[in-house]
UniProtKB/Swiss-Prot annotation:
Protein name (database record): Peroxisomal membrane protein PEX14
Organism lineage string: Eukaryota, Metazoa, Chordata, Craniata, Vertebrata
Subcellular location: Peroxisome membrane
Record-annotated membrane-spanning stretches: 109-127
Residues that bear N-acetylalanine: A2
PANTHER family (alphabetical): PEROXISOMAL MEMBRANE PROTEIN PEX14
Amino acid sequence: MASSEQAEQPNQPSSPPGSENVVPREPLIATAVKFLQNSRVRQSPLATRRAFLKKKGLTDEEIDLAFQQSGTAADEPSPLGPATPVVPVQPPHLTPQPYSPRGSRWRDYGALAIIMAGIAFGFHQLYKRYLLPLILGGREDRKQLERMAASLSELSGTVAQTVTQVQTTLASVQELLRQQQQKVQELAHELATAKATTSTNWILESQNINELKSEINSLKGLLLNRRQFPPSPSAPKIPSWQIPVKSSSPSSPAAVNHHSSSDISPVSNESTSSSPGKDSHSPEGSTATYHLLGPQEEGEGVLDVKGQVRMEVQGEEEKREDKEDEDDEDDDVSHVDEEDVLGVQREDRRGGDGQINEQVEKLRRPEGASNETERD
């Protein structure tokens, strides 16, 4: 018990020497009282108890108070022999014995059963893996061979089917490739032909355009030449009173009308306007020439008159064309309508034929007058 009490006292602070006048500490005194009241401590001598308490840091006053409160100051053990210092006895150390429950036997039995079961399972596996194949090896081999043969036959059938399917798919793919190649070749041929046709069409169009440009340029040149250069001078005109006319031929007016309407081009009115005055001034000279000229000379005179009339008509046509060209300067030459031009030419020709008829009628009048003078 002294050792236990000593273990309880290590936390108590030790008082420094020379601190006797310090106020007694109640908790230390209380612990000292408990220590002194212990039965084993009470059997020890008083000096040893005091020395132990001083070692724990208690002063003499605190020790006296502890003895008074514990009531052990008068206790004095009976001396049995020589005084020997009392040493606190420690209890002997006992070794712990293993705990043996009552069901240990059942555990032993269970472990034995588990071991036996493992051994039996091992023997069973050895028998199943090694002994049975030796005993029943022929049967198993036959069954395995039969199974392998069946699986091989199934595999061969499936392989044959897959091969046929692959062959059919390859044939279809080859056919599709051939068709695609044909289509590609056709498209390439069509493209080549289209390129060739487009190139030829482009060349032809360019040629046509060039021709049209050249024609337009030529027309422009002609128009400019007509405007720049003066018209060609006409042949000298013969007055109508000098033209020989046969008096005895009654069919001459009809012949003249026939030639004027069919062979003679449009004529002008210049020769006709000058011929009547001259005929009126010299009717006798005209009659004299009629009697002097022969039939051949009369025919030549008529032809000369026709040529003069044609020249005059051509001059008037050129003047009219110049006027029309001046009116059409702002119009594009390429957009001229051919039908309008033909209509204008026809109208000009009709007007020229009417002028020729008028000239012929005017030429007939002196012939009739001369015939009347001859008859008189």
